């Protein structure tokens, strides 16, 4: 039997995975395990290996705060979003389509988190892809933002048919206890230009492949592309893409869609609804990981707040286990004062 609880106006259902036929479509029901040690964070004691780094990752397009959405305007949605985030309390969160004032308000209402974000560009309205992380567990080693264009290092630059600047914000995070590092990339691709989406995923995967250390990584974002589209197939390593002046290009590190790893045949996968109950069957949002990462669970959350949604997209949540990286591989993550002593080889 489903039991319903209320938390400051939030409505969510509690069910175990075994009780749910369609695990992607219940309200506030992310409860993959029966034992919960912290709201929104599952205990991995019986399911995950004792080694490696276990993470709870969320991706969420929160809709730009200046949109004239009536009862779904940001001033009404702000509390819904913050209650959702505080309820699930992800280790790392990738937000898309966030304006500066939205990031500032979320930072205030989300205690214990720090964020990595692109710098402001004078005279340009930038929809940020901000990365929030649990500051009690992680510290920020590196961060950056590049712009999907022929001049990716120039803030505000556009290209390939983008009607507005499109970015990727990335961060290298270090877990304080294990001192294990990983990269986190967060993107929002153009919604109109197919050429832009193709060029963007090729540039993105080449950028990831050239990262300065062999740490594992997570990729989140709104790709504005369905599961059968060429950019998504490219990311999964299923097809190459033909790029001008480059010919056919393949993804050097094929990725897994964390939701499809767990639910390969589920049909209820839409993540964009446009505030409609009978929403479009379109899924532009993903959390990707390389094959070395273990996917423990994944969900598309369908939250309601007094008959209203927090955003025009549904958030995604996944539980993953990152592989162990040797101490020598992680050594470069720290300053000289922070570097742990490496044991001599036998």
Report each predicted region and the residues it spans.
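Short catalytic/ligand-binding loop motif for oxyanion handling, primarily in non-cytosolic enzymes
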Residues: 65-68, 101-104, 123-128, 141, ...
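N-terminal, active-site-proximal structural segment of metallo-dependent hydrolase catalytic domains
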Residues: 2-109, 120-127, 322-346
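Active-site beta-strand/loop signature of hydrolases that rely on acidic residues for catalysis
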Residues: 56-62, 81-106, 132, 171, ...
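Structured beta-strand-rich core segments of catalytic domains in phosphoester-bond hydrolases
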Residues: 16-17, 21-49, 92-185, 189, ...
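A generic structural micro-feature
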Residues: 52, 124, 160-165, 278-280, ...
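Metal-dependent phosphoester-hydrolase catalytic domains
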Residues: 6-47, 137, 195, 206-217, ...
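Glycine-rich, phosphate-binding/catalytic loops in enzymes
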Residues: 74-76, 109-112, 201-203, 234-238, ...
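Short, solvent-exposed loop/turn segments at secondary-structure boundaries
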Residues: 69-73, 158, 194-198
């Amino acid at each position: 039997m489903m039991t319903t609880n209320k938390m400051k106006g939030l409505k969510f259902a509690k069910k175990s995975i075994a009780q749910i036929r369609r695990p992607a479509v219940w309200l506030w029901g992310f409860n993959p395990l029966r034992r919960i040690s912290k709201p929104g964070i599952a205990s991995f004691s019986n399911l995950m290996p004792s080694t490696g780094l276990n993470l709870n990752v969320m991706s969420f397009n929160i809709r730009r705060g200046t949109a004239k959405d009536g009862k779904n305007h940001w001033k009404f949605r702000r509390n819904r979003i913050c209650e959702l985030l505080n309820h699930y309390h992800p280790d790392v969160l990738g937000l898309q389509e966030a304006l500066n004032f939205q990031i500032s308000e979320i930072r205030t209402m989300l205690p214990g988190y720090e964020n990595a974000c692109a710098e402001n560009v004078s005279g340009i309205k930038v929809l940020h892809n901000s990365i929030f992380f649990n500051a009690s567990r992680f510290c920020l080693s590196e961060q950056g933002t590049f712009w999907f264009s022929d001049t990716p290092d120039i803030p505000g630059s556009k290209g390939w048919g983008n009607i507005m600047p499109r970015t990727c914000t990335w961060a290298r995070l270090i877990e304080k206890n294990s001192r294990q590092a990983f990269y986190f990339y967060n993107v929002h691709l153009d919604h109109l230009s197919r050429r832009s989406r193709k060029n963007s995923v090729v540039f993105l995967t080449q950028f990831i492949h050239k990262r300065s250390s062999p740490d594992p990584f997570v990729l989140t974002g709104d790709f504005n592309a369905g599961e059968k589209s060429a950019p998504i197939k490219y990311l999964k390593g299923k097809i190459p893409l033909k790029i001008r002046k480059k010919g056919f290009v393949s993804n050097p590190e094929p990725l897994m869609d964390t939701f499809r790893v767990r639910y390969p045949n589920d049909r209820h996968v839409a993540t964009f609804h446009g505030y409609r109950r009978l929403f479009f069957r379109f899924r532009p949002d993903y959390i990707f990981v390389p094959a070395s990462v273990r996917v423990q669970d994944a969900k598309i959350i369908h939250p309601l707040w007094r008959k209203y949604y927090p955003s025009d997209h549904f958030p995604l949540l996944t539980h993953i286990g990152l592989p162990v990286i040797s101490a020598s591989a992680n050594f470069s993550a720290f300053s000289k004062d922070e570097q742990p002593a490496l044991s001599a080889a036998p």
